[in-house]
Amino acid sequence: MEAALLVCQYTIQSLIHLTGEDPGFFNVEIPEFPFYPTCNVCTADVNVTINFDVGGKKHQLDLDFGQLTPHTKAVYQPRGAFGGSENATNLFLLELLGAGELALTMRSKKLPINVTTGEEQQVSLESVDVYFQDVFGTMWCHHAEMQNPVYLIPETVPYIKWDNCNSTNITAVVRAQGLDVTLPLSLPTSAQDSNFSVKTEMLGNEIDIECIMEDGEISQVLPGDNKFNITCSGYESHVPSGGILTSTSPVATPIPGTGYAYSLRLTPRPVSRFLGNNSILYVFYSGNGPKASGGDYCIQSNIVFSDEIPASQDMPTNTTDITYVGDNATYSVPMVTSEDANSPNVTVTAFWAWPNNTETDFKCKWTLTSGTPSGCENISGAFASNRTFDITVSGLGTAPKTLIITRTATNATTTTHKVIFSKAPESTTTSPTLNTTGFADPNTTTGLPSSTHVPTNLTAPASTGPTVSTADVTSPTPAGTTSGASPVTPSPSPWDNGTESKAPDMTSSTSPVTTPTPNATSPTPAVTTPTPNATSPTPAVTTPTPNATSPTLGKTSPTSAVTTPTPNATSPTLGKTSPTSAVTTPTPNATSPTLGKTSPTSAVTTPTPNATGPTVGETSPQANATNHTLGGTSPTPVVTSQPKNATSAVTTGQHNITSSSTSSMSLRPSSNPETLSPSTSDNSTSHMPLLTSAHPTGGENITQVTPASISTHHVSTSSPAPRPGTTSQASGPGNSSTSTKPGEVNVTKGTPPQNATSPQAPSGQKTAVPTVTSTGGKANSTTGGKHTTGHGARTSTEPTTDYGGDSTTPRPRYNATTYLPPSTSSKLRPRWTFTSPPVTTAQATVPVPPTSQPRFSNLSMLVLQWASLAVLTLLLLLVMADCAFRRNLSTSHTYTTPPYDDAETYV
């Protein structure tokens, strides 16, 4: 492995910690890979090496994922596997999660390599190396080491399901490994009289993902939103999973016969695509209070996986406008945060935006020891004595041109600069004004920080004076967060349009030299002061006038017309964008009537809180700086502006709740489902405020409390002892019946929950498959010679001889220290017991399709039968006539000589 890493110019290392039960796959998130902004042809070649240990012998599996095209495809399967088994390519997936992050997923119950007999139980995963070669030929590497060896135990997983779970017509959608679903449910008591606990299980295609509430339960449900964290089995994503329980009934108005209505939103992750679109989400919840007896309930929802491209993979970008005179212009690139005067490994690249030829447009690459790159036209560069890098461009012509510059230091920390060069008109006497700083604080990390997995974005401080802004000038504060700081939540900016804007001349007719104001130009310039980096023989600059209207531009200030998204905007359907061009601004409480429509001519769609993340064809929300604002535009002045902040720092409609930790909780809202499988309903009609996160789908920031330490042991989850006064010994899914974990409840079996199309589920409902359960369950199982039935039973088509054992035997887990023997524990978990009141779901009864009628009447069928008989009779007559004719011919013929076959006997 060490020899292989020598080819890497930049290497990131991480330690992977797998805990809990084995869900049938393992997932490794790999952040901080560079995807260059403003470039639709910037691809990357990716190869992965997986290092195994087989009984003390090293084994290497090489996977070729080919070329990644982040603008057109998000999920990749290996094109080839070298050193692996015959079906190894079917056991791996590589997925783009947005913000430069990849996720490698591998099945854990099937061996991807060939081993000899007796070695099946000795295969452990040691490390993963990812090789990422960008369009400039730079090799970026990520080495992920397993904190403890992960043993792969090959086994067949039986088909598992849960009986008597109320079905819903709501579909749970998975985007970029994050599931998002909002379900209606009912509890017997009002909010302040209830507690609440929830567990989920996702089953399909030999994958079994379980998620439980971290704190066990919500001890008291409050009016409004009740937020909580959940933990899922297997790999723990750096973006936490969570949920929100919201009371939707008035305090004193229960639903007759069912109780009080609530809305439950769940966002577990990671959810592997290996589940498939036929998988099912089971939600088991419990809630009760001192005034009423509670119970355990179960509802289920179908799962579909979206092929939608996640939010931009592009690196965050600082934007700078430069207006120059003459033939040349220069921009100075400062050092990155991790760089010092002795850093040996520094790389600078440059390319013109929107190239169309990968063979010729990516030749401008410099290092500390390299000379002038071959094939780099109209661009030259050199390191100065203070380690800044000066780039000089020439021969640009009169039209503005955009140059993308990146600078990377030793530990792969990268800053990206978007510089727009505009040539001043020949008639003016304005001296060249260059902004060569690009940053307000050189010690601030910009681009891709090495100390955090959360993607960096650019922020602008709130102004304390009059609001005077343009679409292309924001705070000079650069993007990024320092090591250990709280991650910044990216939010699409109304100004990010992705188009290049021109900087017209704004010279006053009464002054030889005019420096434009940020937002408007006075018709008669008065006495003014000079701007930085600009020389003027006459001190004449118009003072900023908020909301003033320019007589030349004829457009109002952005501060007078910008409409920001409101938090109460409700979108019952996802992905609606305006069919018109320019800018679409969401109005308060706007409702989008159409599912999945996108406009091919829309320049920018300002997302509502219920539909976040750009659709296919949209430009990056991180790095697309333009001169367009909502409600009117003000073109960029001729002089240099400060570096543009690509992301607005003020996002209306978001709610931030923090506690004692800096890690943010991602509850991903729904996004545009253009490529979703058809479903009967959409689940984006929740009335709760939507959430933002560092990932593309957004969501409200909820800072979770980070535990002091993570246990490396694999302790089986189990259900608690029953409450006093209860008699049922059934336990929850995947749990034994001996635990006393707080928040988990068991109650007496009673009335089953309400089905989707019937008032009440019948007792002992059976599944369509032969059912055999472990002793913990009671659905169609034989225990001690007694046949019993019950609700919530989990059933399987596999015999108990293969997966027998009692319910207290732990399931297979990631083993950190010893080899795992072949599993004999039951894969059929105890059922989930139900009691009243029944669950009601907001679903319509599926209508029974009408019985199809015959296409022909009896008379028509009779005519067809007689016609067929006539045809057959005619054919028979023709055959008989032909035979008679041939018989007549044969009888009239006489031989004059013997037959030829006996000719030798006649001489």
Swiss-Prot record:
Biotechnological exploitation: Primary surface antigen capable of inducing and reacting with virus-neutralizing antibodies. Almost all EBV candidate vaccines are based on gp350 proteins.
Intravirion side of membrane: 882-907
GO BP, sorted A to Z: symbiont entry into host cell
GO annotations of cellular component type: host cell membrane; membrane; virion membrane
Record field: transmembrane: 861-881
Protein's membrane topology: Single-pass membrane protein
Keywords: Glycoprotein, Host membrane, Host-virus interaction, Late protein, Membrane, Transmembrane, Transmembrane helix, Virion
Record's keyword annotation contains Membrane: yes
Coiled coil residues, start to end: none
Compartment annotation: Virion membrane; Host membrane
Glycan attachment residues as annotated in the record: 47, 87, 114, 166, 169, 195, 229, 277, 318, 328, 345, 356, 378, 386, 411, 435, 443, 457, 497, 519, 533, 547, 568, 589, 610, 624, 627, 645, 656, 683, 701, 735, 746, 755, 780, 815, 858
MF-aspect GO terms: receptor ligand activity
Entry similarity comment: Belongs to the Epstein-Barr GP350 family.
Subunit text: Interacts with host CR2.
Stated role: Initiates virion attachment to host B-lymphocyte cell, leading to virus entry. Acts by binding to host CR2 at the surface of B-lymphocytes, facilitating the binding of viral glycoprotein gp42 to HLA class II molecules. Attachment triggers virion-host membrane fusion and invasion of the host cell.
Name the record gives this protein: Envelope glycoprotein GP350
Organism of derivation: Epstein-Barr virus (strain B95-8) (HHV-4)
Lineage: Viruses, Duplodnaviria, Heunggongvirae, Peploviricota, Herviviricetes
